[in-house]
Regions:
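N-terminal cap/leader regions of alpha/beta-hydrolase-fold enzymes
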Residues: 1-112
Length: 112
């Protein structure tokens, strides 16, 4: 599970280490490693805000496209959400979306 820059490492662990599941919330730099997506066989759950200036929508759309044929991938995009939408105490925190994304990650991990 990676938050912000940890999203990149969750993706890489899934690709290189064979973890049982991977998740990222407002995960940055995943787009740098999309060439490794085809090596990922575990369930993944990635969550992004469409107003996140740290992760351009072009990158989010590329991530979504890279996982299009993955049978156990959830790539969620939350309208109106910025970076740190799931982090309590941050200005961009949205409690409802934080709960939705957290529940999705838990479902992903339970599916392993």
């Amino acid at each position: 599970l990676g938050f912000c820059f940890g999203g990149r490492y969750a993706h890489l662990c899934a690709a290189r280490l064979g973890v049982n599941a991977a998740a990222a919330l407002h995960g940055t730099k995943i787009g740098l490693h999309l060439n490794e997506t085809d090596r990922i066989t575990c369930p993944v759950s990635y969550h992004f805000g469409d107003q996140d200036t740290s992760i351009p929508m072009e990158e989010v759309n590329a991530i979504k496209a890279a996982y299009a044929n993955h049978p156990n991938a959830e790539i969620a995009i939350y309208e109106g959400c910025a970076h740190n939408f799931s982090t309590p105490g941050k200005p961009a925190y949205v409690e409802e979306i934080a709960k939705i994304s957290r529940d999705a990650v838990l479902r992903c991990f339970k599916s392993m």
